[in-house]
């Protein structure tokens, strides 16, 4: 793709990367305040015993794109913008298994407690919009953009889903396990808000919209009482 852009005189390329290229799995490598921005790279060193193949692939792929650009003579370089979304939520129409849909499906099916996990999430519609803005906004050239609507606890998520769907026949649990290790980070999204001008959809709406579309597609079964 990068070679094709060069050969066809493409002026700017927006690349879908991931927060996995920014946030390491190993918490010992996190910043002191657990807050990530675009200056961070996921740790792919061989010494990292908790290395993730997913994080590694995303990190090396994005670095390869930047390295390719730098390898070109200055007169032949085109602009690159990378978008690094967190866990993507919002309307979905897949019927096959996928990570974020599986999380919502499992929450909808369980009355038990959830883990003590807080992670970044973003609406798929905001991710799409960010790609368009990355191509249009001049100041975005040759930058990375961390895309996070909110860093939310899983307990927040099940409470939101329970409030919306338990009156409709579901029995979604809202308790939190107390024996889990805490996984908790924050995201600094100043760049996406100020440079791209992105205004994020509230993540609570994203959870509800995702659940509704996955119910409609059959990915999330309806409770027996409502069928």
PLM regions and their residue ranges:
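Conserved Rossmann-fold NAD(P)-dependent oxidoreductase catalytic core, especially the SDR/UDP-sugar
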Residues: 1-49, 73-74
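Flexible, glycine-rich beta-alpha linker
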Residues: 21-27, 76-99
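Active-site Tyr-X1-5-Lys
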Residues: 40-80
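Glycine/proline-rich active-site loop of Rossmann-fold NAD(P)-dependent oxidoreductases
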Residues: 74-76, 90-103, 133-145
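Glycine-rich Rossmann NAD(P)(H)-binding loop
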Residues: 90, 114-117, 145-152, 180-181, ...
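Alpha-helical substrate-binding/gating segment
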Residues: 105-145
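Mid/C-terminal beta-alpha module of Rossmann-like enzyme folds, strongest
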Residues: 128-178, 189, 209-214, 218-227
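Conserved C-terminal active-site "lid" loop/helix of NAD(P)H-dependent oxidoreductases
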Residues: 178-199
């Amino acid at each position: 793709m990068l070679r094709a852009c060069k050969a066809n005189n493409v002026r700017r390329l927006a690349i879908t990367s991931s927060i996995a290229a920014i946030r390491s799995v190993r918490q010992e490598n996190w910043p002191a305040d657990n807050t990530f921005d675009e200056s961070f790279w996921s740790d792919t060193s061989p010494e990292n015993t908790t290395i993730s193949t997913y994080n590694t692939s995303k990190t090396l792929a994005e670095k390869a794109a930047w390295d390719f650009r730098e390898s070109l003579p200055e007169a032949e370089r085109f602009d690159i913008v990378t978008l690094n979304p967190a866990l993507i939520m919002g309307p979905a129409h897949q019927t096959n298994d996928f990570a974020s849909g599986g999380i919502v499906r499992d929450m909808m099916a369980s009355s038990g407690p959830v883990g003590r996990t807080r992670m970044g999430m973003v609406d798929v519609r905001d991710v799409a919009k960010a790609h368009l803005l990355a191509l249009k906004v001049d100041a975005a050239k040759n930058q990375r953009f961390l895309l996070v609507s909110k860093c939310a606890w899983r307990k927040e998520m099940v409470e939101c889903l329970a409030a919306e769907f338990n009156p409709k026949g579901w029995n979604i649990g809202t308790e939190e396990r107390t024996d889990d290790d805490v996984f908790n980070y924050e995201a600094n999204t100043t760049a996406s808000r100020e440079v791209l001008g992105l205004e994020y959809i509230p993540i609570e709406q994203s959870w509800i919209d995702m659940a509704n579309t996955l119910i409609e597609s059959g990915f999330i079964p309806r409770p027996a009482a409502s069928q």
